[in-house]
């Protein structure tokens, strides 16, 4: 039976808050550049760390179907909700809710990339993460029976494909290109788990942990400083690929140090947020819209320049906390009644007199 690691819950919770902060109009700010350097790599690294390969005697088809239920089914559920929610928002704000809007939106949902194209619209861009993670897990599950050199060769071939796609302005459907770019991060997490790279820091002195944090933060700074502009796995924007991987891994390492320091602090809220990262990932853009309109209302009362205070790092932190707190009870409900919406495939809803271990 798997033992739940509390520091991983902290890592996922901090990671999802960084995602919200990054999407809160922080892309053109210096701290937004730092957040984008590692907030999505963190999730792929954590997933690799937690990954359990399918047993050799188990059907690979069953492994794929399990990941379809835990990632692709929620993708379409939240995707359809996003189309309807966006149409409703457009209706009340005077935007487009025509037949053409619906056709482009559903086409974008089927295409499965986290951005608009000439013929498609993606109403909820963070949803790209779900099909990308699906491909990463399916590829990793297939390669689990092969030796490391085969995995390295596949990662290298995938990165060559990404470079060619980027050079010629092409993309693969269902965020497969993003999956190829994220695959090395996934394997970095798997390697850290396999060789116990974090154990010395988890069981060692605090001074050693502080030293690792300082080195990781410094390497992250250098990576961002020398890698011009934002990196984005969604759009396969990497600028300098070596610096992208260096920044993603070092930034994640710094977060891990903080989370290992918090390992002794247990919280039902953090556990719930960790369980609900898929839901938060899928719905936070609408939370940002609600909070942003609330800020605009306050700014209108404050007068000219009233919005300046809300376009800042503290406002982004507060917004992330508000959205995660606002989704706490929906997550608790879904954990008991609708685990599919949390990506918990194969887990039965909890009835009276029953308990369920979060996983």
List the predicted regions and their residue ranges.
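Alpha-helical transmembrane segments and their immediate juxtamembrane cytosolic regions
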Residues: 1-359
């Amino acid at each position: 039976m798997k033992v739940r690691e509390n520091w991983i819950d902290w890592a996922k919770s901090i990671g999802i808050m960084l995602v919200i902060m990054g999407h809160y109009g922080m892309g053109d700010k210096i701290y937004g550049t730092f957040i984008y350097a590692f907030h999505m790599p963190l999730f792929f690294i954590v997933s690799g760390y937690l990954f359990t390969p399918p047993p050799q005697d188990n059907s690979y088809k069953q492994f794929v179907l399990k990941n379809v239920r835990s990632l692709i089914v929620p993708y379409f559920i939240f995707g359809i909700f996003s189309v309807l929610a966006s149409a409703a928002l457009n209706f009340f704000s005077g935007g487009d809710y025509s037949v053409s809007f619906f056709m482009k939106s559903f086409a974008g949902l089927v295409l499965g990339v986290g951005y608009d194209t000439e013929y498609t619209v993606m109403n909820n861009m963070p949803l790209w993460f779900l099909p990308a993670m699906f491909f990463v897990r399916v590829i990793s599950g297939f390669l689990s029976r092969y030796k490391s050199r085969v995995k390295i060769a596949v990662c290298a071939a995938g990165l060559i494909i990404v470079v060619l796609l980027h050079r010629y302005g092409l993309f693969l459907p269902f965020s497969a290109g993003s999956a190829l770019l994220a695959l090395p991060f996934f394997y970095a997490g798997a390697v850290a788990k396999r060789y116990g790279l974090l154990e010395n820091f988890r069981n060692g002195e605090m001074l050693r942990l502080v030293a690792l944090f300082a080195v990781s933060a410094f390497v992250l700074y250098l990576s961002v400083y020398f890698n011009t502009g934002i990196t984005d796995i969604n759009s396969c924007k990497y600028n300098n690929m070596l610096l992208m991987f260096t920044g993603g891994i070092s930034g994640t390492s710094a977060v891990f140090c903080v989370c290992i320091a918090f390992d002794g602090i247990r919280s039902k809220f953090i556990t719930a947020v960790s369980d609900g990262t898929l839901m938060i990932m899928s719905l936070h853009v609408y939370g940002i819209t609600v909070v942003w309109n609330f800020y605009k209302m306050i700014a209108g009362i404050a007068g000219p320049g009233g919005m300046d205070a809300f376009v800042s790092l503290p406002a982004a932190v507060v917004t992330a906390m508000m959205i995660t707190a606002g989704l706490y009870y929906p997550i608790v409900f879904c954990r008991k009644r609708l685990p599919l919406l949390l990506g918990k495939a194969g887990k039965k809803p909890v009835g009276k007199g029953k308990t369920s271990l979060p996983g």
